[in-house]
């Protein structure tokens, strides 16, 4: 391998000739051979935005020439375009302030500018008015805000739109509800889907609430928050340039001491990501359980068959998209624990868990953005209800007895449900057997009872063709009260007359 000699304050070191990084990047490569997780590309892109904005602000303050600032800006634009991704090889597991990554960006910009005829020093020019202690926290917030606005929110809103279309496609389909994994009262399928939609939309509102804190930047605080070596008004200039480049309302944090030592804004924002992950897991579980089967499960939903599900069981198809969603959700929840603990370690004037916080936050954002789109395209858009199975389960449910509770009371309704379950009959048969509901009305009974119920104001609360009474009745319990017999013209004057008319026999 061809090398060239670079130097820093610790001396000379050999660097691969084909790469544009310098001595400090090379030392980090040799000293931190830990894991394989490189700094997220989102962090490098955020640094490219930040370095360009800082260069332009330094030019406005007279600390750089317009030509120097222009050279830095040109290289930063190429970095954001992804042209030099191979020049940023450092892993997450390095110094907790991210100093090596900051210097990696500085060195690459300086060397690429030198290739274009502009000699720049990584520290004196590219890092002017800056410290790793304020640039890495700022780059972290820039990357986090952009990942939320460009990845998570658009993907989640597309998923919510898919649920809305599913909701509108089946407005009148009734299904049985379930609580505690047991049968419950009925609801519309569209109502259940509206709940899924809101489970996606609510965390989006939480994320928008968290964004204003994420857009506050530590830039201008330099080493410990005092702003040493940074011109007055420099932080406002940098944020103004960033707003123009990204369209995001970045502002300087009013208290730089807080900005350098605390990552509470990151914890708050990731809490909203965790809420989205938890809700996605709930939705995915609902869908895969309701699609279980095809013959021995619930089978109330049909989901797309995307790939074979088993290497040994022919014809088996699994809810793979739902499983991918649940695994991504588990990872996000683990990331949340890491971010929370890292944020608690801001000892004195600087939090030194910045790279791991950045890695976990950006991984969560990337996972959620990708999984929302994958789940929408390969599962949600292809969901159809199994109307036949839904209807059969609806009519077979014992919890329909809840509708009778206002009429016959809670205990009587419970007795009906238990009898139907014990005897293996339908709920209707159990209610009839216990006498809480009569069969179809005959002769004058229908007309008399219709008037009686109408006077009580309860006509519309009964099923068509049936009448209910508050308690178990004797065999003659449907006879009208004595004082009302004369009004009921179609009802016989006594039980014996009723028997004679019914059977045609004498006494």
Tell where the protein language model's regions lie, with residue ranges.
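Short, low-complexity intrinsically disordered segments enriched in A/P/G/S/L with frequent Arg
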Residues: 479-481, 489-490
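Short, intrinsically disordered C-terminal tails of secreted or membrane-associated proteins
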Residues: 500-506
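Aromatic (phenylalanine/tyrosine) cluster motif
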Residues: 443, 449, 466-469, 491, ...
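Iron-sulfur-cluster electron-transfer modules
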Residues: 453-478
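Tryptophan (W) side chains
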Residues: 448, 495-498
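Polybasic, lysine-rich low-complexity intrinsically disordered segments
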Residues: 459, 484-485
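Conserved, well-structured ligand/cofactor-binding cores
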Residues: 1-452, 456
């Amino acid at each position: 391998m061809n090398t060239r000699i670079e130097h820093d304050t610790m001396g000379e070191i050999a660097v691969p000739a084909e790469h544009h990084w310098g001595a400090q990047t090379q030392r980090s490569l040799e000293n931190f051979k830990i894991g394989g997780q490189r700094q997220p590309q989102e962090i490098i892109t955020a640094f490219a935005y930040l370095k360009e904005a800082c260069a332009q602000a330094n030019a406005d303050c007279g600390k750089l020439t317009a030509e120097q600032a222009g050279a830095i800006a040109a290289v930063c634009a190429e970095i954001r375009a992804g042209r030099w991704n191979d020049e940023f090889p450092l892993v997450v597991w390095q110094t907790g302030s991210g100093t090596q990554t900051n210097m990696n960006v500085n060195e690459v910009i300086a060397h690429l500018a030198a290739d274009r005829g502009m000699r720049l020093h990584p520290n004196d020019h590219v890092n002017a008015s800056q410290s790793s202690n304020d640039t890495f926290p700022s780059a972290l917030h820039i990357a986090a805000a952009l990942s939320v606005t460009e990845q998570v929110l658009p993907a989640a809103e597309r998923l919510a739109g898919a649920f809305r279309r599913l909701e509108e496609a089946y407005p009148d389909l009734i299904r049985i509800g379930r609580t505690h994994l047991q049968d419950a009262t009925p609801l519309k399928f569209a109502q259940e889907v509206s709940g899924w939609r809101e489970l996606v939309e609510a965390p989006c509102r939480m994320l928008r609430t968290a964004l204003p804190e994420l857009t506050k930047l530590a830039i201008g605080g330099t080493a410990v928050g005092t702003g040493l070596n940074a011109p007055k008004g420099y932080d406002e200039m940098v944020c103004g340039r960033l707003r123009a480049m990204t369209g995001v309302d970045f502002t300087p944090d009013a208290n730089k001491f807080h900005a350098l030592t605390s990552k509470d804004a990151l914890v708050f924002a990731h809490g909203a990501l965790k809420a989205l992950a938890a809700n996605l897991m709930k939705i995915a579980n609902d869908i895969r359980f309701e699609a279980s089967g095809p013959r021995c499960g619930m089978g109330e939903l049909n989901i797309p068959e995307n790939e074979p599900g088993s290497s040994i069981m022919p014809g088996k198809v699994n809810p793979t998209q739902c499983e991918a969603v649940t695994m991504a959700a588990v990872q996000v929840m683990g990331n949340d624990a890491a971010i929370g603990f890292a944020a608690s370690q801001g000892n004195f004037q600087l939090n030194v868990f910045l790279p791991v916080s950045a890695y976990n936050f950006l991984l969560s954002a990337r996972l959620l953005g990708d999984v929302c789109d994958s789940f929408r395209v390969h599962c949600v858009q292809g969901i159809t209800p199994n109307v036949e199975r839904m209807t059969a389960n609806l009519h077979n449910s014992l919890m329909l007895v809840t509708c009778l509770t206002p009429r016959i009371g809670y205990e009587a309704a419970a007795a009906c449900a238990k009898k139907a379950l014990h005897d293996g009959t339908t709920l209707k048969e159990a209610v009839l057997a216990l006498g809480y509901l009569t069969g179809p009305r005959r002769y004058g009974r229908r007309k008399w009872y219709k008037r009686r119920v109408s006077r009580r104001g309860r006509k519309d609360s009964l099923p068509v063709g049936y009448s209910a009474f508050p308690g178990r009745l004797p065999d003659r319990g449907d006879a009208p009260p004595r004082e009302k017999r004369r009004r009921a013209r179609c009802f016989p004057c006594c039980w014996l007359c009723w028997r004679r008319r019914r059977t045609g026999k004498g006494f």
